[in-house]
Amino acid sequence: MSKSNSLDLKKIRADFPILHRKVHGKPLVYFDNAATTQKPRSVINAISDYYERYNANVHRGIHLLAEEATAAYEGSRGKLAKFIGARNPAEIIFTRGTTEAINLVAYSWGEKFLKEGDTILLTLMEHHSNLVPWQFLAQRKKLNLEFVPVTAAGYLEDPEGAIRQLRPKLVSFVHVSNVLGTVNPVKNLAKVAHEAGATVLVDGAQAVAHLPVDVASLGCDFYAFSSHKMMGPTGTGGLWGRAEILERMPPFLGGGEMIKEVSLRESSFKDAPYKFEAGTPSIAPVIGLGAAVDYLSSVGMENIRHYEEEFLEYAFEKLAAVPGLTIYGPQNSEDRGGVIAFNVAGIHPHDLATVLDQEGVAVRSGNHCAMPLHTHLKINASARASFAFYNTTSEIDVLVEAIGKAKKILKV
């Protein structure tokens, strides 16, 4: 693995305490990173440090603890902005995660700027979080929902043509599919969408911990992501939005902290990002997210991407050799993130996942919050192995061996 020799896997794995535990007496092989990633010690320590040393509310107090908490909280905003290439930390809105970030755009931007008869263009490979909010909005405002189909190879089928033909007001799509692993051509699609007069939202949940993200270069208008899928805590995440768009959007929720003035009859609101952050925020998780960004930056996103591409090549080779195993999505690691959804003929994914768990291997089974995609693939469910830069090729060998054991146990 010449490209990835800058990754010290022994040191990296030592940074993640949970990787050293056993499951059913077997070493843990954690291949469920698309659901949530594990946390390095530095993230755990950052959260503990907040609660032990400077636990206080942010923005409101003038005492030392409040000032320290505010500095750490806002420091995370600055780190995130730099990490994803935002021009200004004020373009980063903290949310509960990708789901809330997309809902924020739907309820704020969508309610204000979309009108009856307008079209929203999505794709068949979307997570439910980038589908259901638009269904709600379309039902409320009588909008048209259209979908870019997916080819048998797992790529979007002529999305540029769909954009030019349908002239949507919003194009919203996933950066990396959580089922197919497909890395979509964000920069090109954003360019075509803007030429057609559309605003562009990208679901980056499966991208930010796996490949370099630069929102300025990508050219989108919104980019949503979750902390817990980038080595950070659960309960937080973010939305990046162009400053000029955020400025025109109304608040999403009402309450404390997001206001300038309040009278009995009306209120005025702060500028972005604060007008979108009502109430006491998830302070400890945000501070932990900042520590996660520090950790990812120290490893290097280019290094992580190179390693995961080579890791995927190894995984493809080994899994393809398993009789009866079907992999869904692109077979080229350059076009794919660290996700492999698959089925083994004659074995239900839930049964397979159960046997794998007994062998210490954690995978996901089901529809992975992507029912329409599974319907399109003509399957009810799939097993999914999803990877991170702390996984090793020897763990792929364990997975393949465990699949073989499942076939014997289930007499396939």
Model-predicted segments: where are they?
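Pyridoxal 5′-phosphate
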Residues: M1-V412
